[in-house]
Amino acid sequence: MNKLASLIKSSGYADRVLTDQQLGRILGGSDDRRYGQVKRALQSGALLRVKRGHYVLADEFRKNPVHPYALAQVLVVGSYVSMETALAFHGWIPEAVFTTVSVTPGRKSKEMDHPDFGRFAFIPLALHRSGFLAGVQRHVVSDQAMLVASPLRALMDLVAYRKQKWEGIAWVQNNMRIDQTHLVQIQAKGFSALRGVYMHKSASGFLYGLEKAVRDLKASQRALRNEASS
């Protein structure tokens, strides 16, 4: 085993994203010595650079493989996973998603192809600052923490990004391929949490239309159940 990897594992940091400062505390010694150890570990593939000053051990030295959602929040601090990526995470859309899409608190879009961890996209939206994390939940997957939008928040972020106007529930079911069995799971408090989050009227109008459509779906299901039981 690579010496640096062995030291990191024995320190209990094998499954974490490590900064230069943390590596310095683990390795000790002079700056030149630490630089040499890190350089050799990078060249051997035992250590992988996430971005400048941030590293992870290669999967062979970790308990769990690196999760791209956790890395996304290291690549752009303050971001959260959303849109199609979050919808796929929750099982709301059938398609596989090969880009980790996140919403960023910054003003500029950013895309990057990481040689080890895949493709990432960071998208800014016109949001009121106080509602930036409304409907965003902390998940822990394979001992790695990540912020992921709820299904409703992920859908609404996508709507806001595309500037999609409300055209009826058929757009959600046909264009996004979201089944009504998922839609009726959305609770009233989920809609309430997102009111006032989006700056554009089209997004707010979509949220209002979707909330009414979901209420109608639930009412229809109740009526069918009552009819079947009578």
Which sequence ranges carry the predicted segments?
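Short gly/ser-rich loop at a beta-strand->alpha-helix junction or flexible surface loop bordering the NTP-binding
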Residues: S44, R49-A58, V66-F132
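Hydrophobic alpha-helical interaction segments
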Residues: A134-S230
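Structural motif detector for alpha-helix initiation sites
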Residues: D20, M83, P151-L152
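Short, structured interface segments that constitute the first stable element of a domain
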Residues: G29, I123-S142
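Hydrophobic/aromatic-lined pockets within catalytic cores
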Residues: G28, G91, A160-Q164
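A general structural signal for short secondary-structure junctions and capping/turn motifs
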Residues: K39, E111-D113, A145-V148
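Short beta-edge/loop segments at beta->alpha junctions of small alpha/beta modules
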Residues: M1-G78
